[in-house]
Amino acid sequence: MKKLLIASLLFGTTTTVFAAPFVAKDIRVDGVQGDLEQQIRASLPVRAGQRVTDNDVANIVRSLFVSGRFDDVKAHQEGDVLVVSVVAKSIISDVKIKGNSVIPTEALKQNLDANGFKVGDVLIREKLNEFAKSVKEHYASVGRYNATVEPIVNTLPNNRAEILIQINEDDKAKLASLTFKGNESVSSSTLQEQMELQPDSWWKLWGNKFEGAQFEKDLQAIRDYYLNNGYAKAQITKTDVQLNDEKTKVNVTIDVNEGLQYDLRSARIIGNLGGMSAELEPLLSALHLNDTFRRSDIADVENAIKAKLGERGYGNTTVNSVPDFDDANKTLAITFVVDAGRRLTVRQLRFEGNTVSADSTLRQEMRQQEGTWYNSQLVELGKIRLDRTGFFETVENRIDPINGSNDEVDVVYKVKERNTGSINFGIGYGTESGISYQTSIKQDNFLGTGAAVSIAGTKNDYGTSVNLGYTEPYFTKDGVSLGGNIFFENYDNSKSDTSSNYKRTTYGSNVTLGFPVNENNSYYVGLGHTYNKISNFALEYNRNLYIQSMKFKGNGIKTNDFDFSFGWNYNSLNRGYFPTKGVKASLGGRVTIPGSDNKYYKLSADVQGFYPLDRDHRWVVSAKASAGYANGFGNKRLPFYQTYTAGGIGSLRGFAYGSIGPNAIYAEHGNGTFNKISSDVIGGNAITTASAELIVPTPFVSDKSQNTVRTSLFVDAASVWNTKWKSDKNGLESKVLKDLPDYGKSSRIRASTGVGFQWQSPIGPLVFSYAKPIKKYENDDVEQFQFSIGGSF
């Protein structure tokens, strides 16, 4: 009986003490009904008709109370009936969150779920209050000191409850003042320049809101400034953050102890060097001896030592930099104390987070092999190659030790996949060209194999095109790729505002093989076939020169062409998805081969580079240039439908697609005299484009989401010309020539400037651009605003 009483006290219950064991002819459960009542009955250690003891009652009370589903549990005897009485906690039937914008609803719901507040869980009010308190503390950490978080519980019938988290985020507190103390050598203005947070001023639009996390980053920036300018002993000794009574303004005081400014007099490497002393010693040449000490240089050498040893299998190397100060001469010496550790073997390569991409697809990008010495360079190269596929938002790698082994590890790549399938719809509007539409369905990682499958189509007032494409990047184990396209186009250019009049039907196919040379270089070769049927074309001067060279008769053209394509590609981009560093370049060509009706060739060159301006790659300069040249051979001219034009996203924003190039010259009334100058674009056989962009942090977007959006300020330029114009124009009358520009001049450049925005949204890629021409010519078709929208799968 004493044991039963103790159990009752421990569990906060009251239990009637039985005088003696008895046979329970019936068992009654009070306080609940339905499924919960049946669950309690099923959990009882006794059944009706069985003998009940004090120990049985204690077990009943203990097991029900420990389940966490009840606020109170009692058990007692009423005659020959065992009565179990409970007060059940509410079951959560719904969870709602209102008033939040800074913290995403999804993030709050994930935290609620993790803390036991999802639908179907037992409601524990104390824990709910603790959760609300932690959210309020988070708001305070980001400068929203007046934010309120109120958990509201609405009790419903049948022991159910709804939870509402009502949030009022309020505004961030402003940094009212910033004061430095103890800085005798470095001015307060210089220290303030190192910080993102700045005191409030009437002209400041952002940067004046106080945020704890940013304040910590700024303090580290101040430390880095001192350490990289010789103040090796500099410390921030105290920070004082004072709120006003309304919690709307913050006054900050930062105390520093600068110490002396040192020069670096010498450096050496000692310790367990894994037998690589000769390879490590040259790394010290990166240091600037007898010059101002810079902690960043020391960190670079530390990383270089780890990387060099990592290439030989020492994946757990530790490097400690020990300074030896000479205060009298204001110099210091650095000793790099190295422990290479054990040489490691890679047991397995493992992948996490790839729910769509097959492991075998990711393994194709690996350079580190299982069962070989660990090589940090090859492991990092695998990460870079995964990034370049464009299949992933983020790629991280780590090494996991193996239980029971001190020289084996697993290399783990953790990826976050992005939507690689898309259904895109594009639309553009021009002052003269009107509305045009483009649609495409593309899957860059088909069934997780890495293969790309696409169906693309364009529909506008003057035509339709369809292209089916397939690329297998892992056609062979050696990395040879196989790609191909089947295409169909049907255009009535007489309805186009920017192209010379004719009707064209085209279909064909091509196949391409790509061969890797090394990690950054590859080349390709391909074969293709194209059939063209052209009719209803008006008599136009440039077109007539082509027809004469081909000796066509009548008002119809049919050609069958076979071509050989070739090219070289270079890629050192850090990732395929919104790159911030590296270069991508290509040279290519295509030439018709024997058996073709036409005889012509086309050459192209493209290069694009990304150059980060800061360590976090938030500010990036991007430059892009391209050139193309085409011509006929064997006394045949370049087909007029193979000429170049510019305009639109990808070549010259701010101008309508395909609207830039030499114009058509028609024969008026079909009399054979070419004297009607048109605004229709016939194109040229040479083109150059150039673009410079400053990629900037997107305003009002959190740091976490910056990698899904891209904002840039750009300048575009392009020129399209006819290199044979000097001889071509001889067939025109002088009165026509005087009204024509010199189409042979490459200096007839168009240019525009504007702002671009890209967003990899949950529904797919969104691209917007607004550009204003800064150099244009008469009759140019301006299209300032362009955008495309899409949906992903």
UniProtKB/Swiss-Prot annotation:
<dbReference type="InterPro" id="IPR010827">
    <property type="entry name" value="BamA/TamA_POTRA"/>
</dbReference>
<keyword id="KW-0677">Repeat</keyword>
<keyword id="KW-0998">Cell outer membrane</keyword>
<feature type="domain" description="POTRA 3">
    <location>
        <begin position="173"/>
        <end position="259"/>
    </location>
</feature>
<keyword id="KW-0812">Transmembrane</keyword>
<dbReference type="Pfam" id="PF01103">
    <property type="entry name" value="Omp85"/>
</dbReference>
<feature type="domain" description="POTRA 2">
    <location>
        <begin position="90"/>
        <end position="170"/>
    </location>
</feature>
<keyword id="KW-0732">Signal</keyword>
<comment type="similarity">
    <text>Belongs to the BamA family.</text>
</comment>
<dbReference type="InterPro" id="IPR000184">
    <property type="entry name" value="Bac_surfAg_D15"/>
</dbReference>
<feature type="domain" description="POTRA 5">
    <location>
        <begin position="344"/>
        <end position="418"/>
    </location>
</feature>
<dbReference type="Pfam" id="PF07244">
    <property type="entry name" value="POTRA"/>
</dbReference>
<dbReference type="InterPro" id="IPR023707">
    <property type="entry name" value="OM_assembly_BamA"/>
</dbReference>
<keyword id="KW-0472">Membrane</keyword>
<dbReference type="GO" id="GO:0051205">
    <property type="term" value="P:protein insertion into membrane"/>
</dbReference>
<feature type="signal peptide">
    <location>
        <begin position="1"/>
        <end position="19"/>
    </location>
</feature>
<keyword id="KW-1134">Transmembrane beta strand</keyword>
<protein>
    <recommendedName>
        <fullName>Outer membrane protein assembly factor BamA</fullName>
    </recommendedName>
</protein>
<feature type="domain" description="POTRA 1">
    <location>
        <begin position="22"/>
        <end position="89"/>
    </location>
</feature>
<dbReference type="GO" id="GO:0043165">
    <property type="term" value="P:Gram-negative-bacterium-type cell outer membrane assembly"/>
</dbReference>
<comment type="function">
    <text>Part of the outer membrane protein assembly complex, which is involved in assembly and insertion of beta-barrel proteins into the outer membrane.</text>
</comment>
<feature type="domain" description="POTRA 4">
    <location>
        <begin position="262"/>
        <end position="341"/>
    </location>
</feature>
<dbReference type="GO" id="GO:1990063">
    <property type="term" value="C:Bam protein complex"/>
</dbReference>
<dbReference type="InterPro" id="IPR034746">
    <property type="entry name" value="POTRA"/>
</dbReference>
<comment type="subunit">
    <text>Part of the Bam complex.</text>
</comment>
<dbReference type="InterPro" id="IPR039910">
    <property type="entry name" value="D15-like"/>
</dbReference>
